[in-house]
Design a protein with these regions (language model features):
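N-terminal interaction/assembly modules
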Residues: 1-132, 136-163
Length: 163
């Protein structure tokens, strides 16, 4: 499983948290099992392989961190979504942006460019081209404004390598 696939699985879980009353830990306990992956994997190839320990740890950190910092991340989205009310933003796009912003803010081992590029690639799978451009614009503005070093921070070559 690649880091990008693990990120996408985390985004699915973050998206799901927006519809229920479950905590991040409750959702992770229910979803992060080999049995659940096998069940989902019958219809969704992304889940065909259960994550190894490192990948599972990454997914758990993303889901827990994004969930616990949700209000802060939503404030960033609202700040950079000029002309858009937060309620108008598609839920999947919001989950994607929250995840990328969490990685930029709280996961220093993930290059900013890798978090943003992967988020845009994932958005292309689920959203219209207009929403993908919106996601790219929000994340780009966020990083350029909040983190001046964005231009100098390289993308890891191994971002899509098997881990």
């Amino acid at each position: 499983m690649t880091r990008s696939n693990a990120r996408e699985i985390a985004i699915h879980m973050i998206f799901e948290l927006g519809f229920g009353n479950s905590s991040a830990d409750e959702l992770l306990n229910n979803e992060m099992t080999p049995e659940r992956f096998a069940q989902i994997g019958e219809e969704e190839p992304l889940y065909a392989q259960f994550p190894n320990e490192k990948q599972a740890q990454y997914i758990r950190e993303l889901v827990r961190g994004t969930f616990s910092h949700g209000p802060e991340l939503d404030d960033y989205i609202a700040r950079y979504a000029v002309g858009w009310s937060f309620e108008r933003i598609p839920r999947m796009a919001a989950a994607i942006m929250r995840t990328a912003m969490y990685e930029v803010l709280y996961m220093p081992d993930i290059p900013n460019a890798a978090a943003i590029n992967s988020a845009v690639d994932i958005a292309k799978k689920y959203e219209t081209p207009e929403v993908v451009s919106f996601v790219n614009g929000i994340l780009g503005s966020f990083v350029r404004t909040e983190f001046q070093e964005f231009q100098d921070k390289p993308v890891k070559e191994a971002e899509n390598a098997e881990e």
